[in-house]
Design a protein with these regions (language model features):
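Conserved nucleotide-sugar phosphate-binding/catalytic loop shared by glycosyltransferases and other
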Residues: 13-14, 32-92
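A short, glycine/small-residue-rich beta-strand->loop->alpha-helix junction that serves as a flexible
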Residues: 10-24, 212-213
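A conserved, positively charged/aromatic
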Residues: 132, 145-156, 249
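A donor-sugar binding/catalytic signature common to diverse glycosyltransferases
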Residues: 110-115, 245-288
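Donor-nucleotide binding loops and adjacent catalytic segments primarily
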Residues: 27-28, 190-254, 264, 306
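C-terminal amphipathic helix plus adjacent low-complexity
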Residues: 312-350
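Conserved nucleotide-sugar donor-binding subdomain of glycosyltransferases
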Residues: 75-110, 115-120
Length: 350
């Protein structure tokens, strides 16, 4: 009789779609029963042996005798010790209580934390080994140091040597670089069927961006200045929506996107030529990635959405790129991340 797999918790941050997308890419490679904790609604379909627990929000305003109070005004950082632990916020309390209750009742072998300093600390205080997913940028602040200190393993979803980080150097013995994690890894590219002589340009907004009417207007202005290009906007609020953009991504001549970890890993999986527009994110996350892409000549990187007249030259530069996306080590990255989790979960059986 085959022994049952370990029980693993998985905390998925609710900002944007990147953390959820990463979970969905890694999950098929992990032989375990998994319980996901997240404030997002449960997806319409889940992998086998996976359960979803919807957590209360901890970022909405509360009502006090003095009127509405936002948690950012309730000492959420504890004088710089943590990132988010607002005082007297019932949602925050119920959120952590739900995790603690499940851990106490179920005794998981490990909990993946993607991402939250407070959840990583809670998990370790309850005697369960956390596997912390880290992100690029300047993570030298005290809360990140605390999260790294309590983590049994730290998963970096990018290749070793491409993102310098003194904050991670100090925990190198527990750090595992797995490469860029893409849901499209190992898929064959789709052959483009476009109009000869016209460059196909695909715009994929970052999963955490607002997009919307302003982006649609910017794309229309760019298209007007590039008559030899055909532009397509997917998502972003006003663009077309497809559940699986792989065909469009892998067949486009040039892709315009942000510098989030999923976006970049998807570019690598497609072998795309790209114009990358880093978005403002905490801890300089996307700008750090943009600098890496520029240094490795993997993409044309610009600081902000370009003026319409700049697009002809940018598309020409991107079209001329010969990016060596093998540097991003997408192949096998999701399985390597799952192996890190499985390693930590196996300790419970010792």
């Amino acid at each position: 009789m085959t022994a049952p797999g370990p029980l693993v918790g998985w905390y998925v941050h609710h900002h944007g779609a990147g953390h959820l997308t990463r979970f969905r890419a890694v999950r098929p490679h992990l032989d375990a029963d998994v319980v996901v904790f997240c404030s997002l609604p449960c997806p319409s379909s889940l992998p086998e042996r996976t359960r979803w627990v919807v957590l209360p929000r901890d970022d909405d305003a509360t009502t006090s005798p003095d009127g509405p109070r936002h948690p950012r005004d309730a000492s959420p950082t504890v004088r710089g010790l943590l990132h988010w632990a607002p005082l007297h916020h019932r949602g925050h309390a119920r959120r952590l209580a739900a995790l603690a209750s499940w851990i106490g009742e179920s005794g998981p072998a490990a909990v993946v934390v993607d991402v939250s300093v407070e959840v990583a600390l809670l998990v370790r205080l309850l005697g369960v080994p956390p596997v912390v997913v880290t992100q690029p940028g300047d993570r030298s602040d005290d809360p990140h140091r605390l999260a790294y200190d309590v983590a049994e393993r730290i998963v970096a979803p990018w290749p070793r040597g491409l993102h310098g980080s003194p904050a991670l150097d100090r925990v190198a013995e527990r750090l595992r670089h797995v490469g860029g994690i893409s849901r499209f890894a190992d898929r064959a590219p789709v052959v483009r069927e476009g109009v000869e002589g016209r460059t196909s340009v695909l715009v994929l907004p970052g999963s955490g961006s607002g997009g919307g009417a302003r982006l649609a207007e910017d794309v229309a202005l760019a298209a007007a200045r590039t008559p030899d290009a055909s532009w397509t906007l997917l998502g972003g609020g006003t663009g077309a929506w497809v559940d699986d953009p792989w065909a469009a991504l892998s067949s486009a001549d040039v892709v315009v996107t942000a510098a989030g970890q999923n976006s970049v890993a998807d570019l690598a999986a497609a072998g795309a030529r790209a114009v990358v527009v880093p978005e403002d994110r905490p801890f300089d996350e996307q700008r750090s990635t943009g600098r890496t892409l520029d240094a490795q000549r993997l993409a044309v990187v610009v600081d902000a959405w370009p003026a319409p007249d700049a697009w002809p030259a940018l598309i020409a530069r991107a079209s001329a790129l010969r990016p060596d996306w093998s540097l991003w080590q997408v192949d096998g990255a999701a399985a390597r991340a799952a192996d890190v989790v499985a390693e930590v979960a196996s300790w419970q059986q010792r």
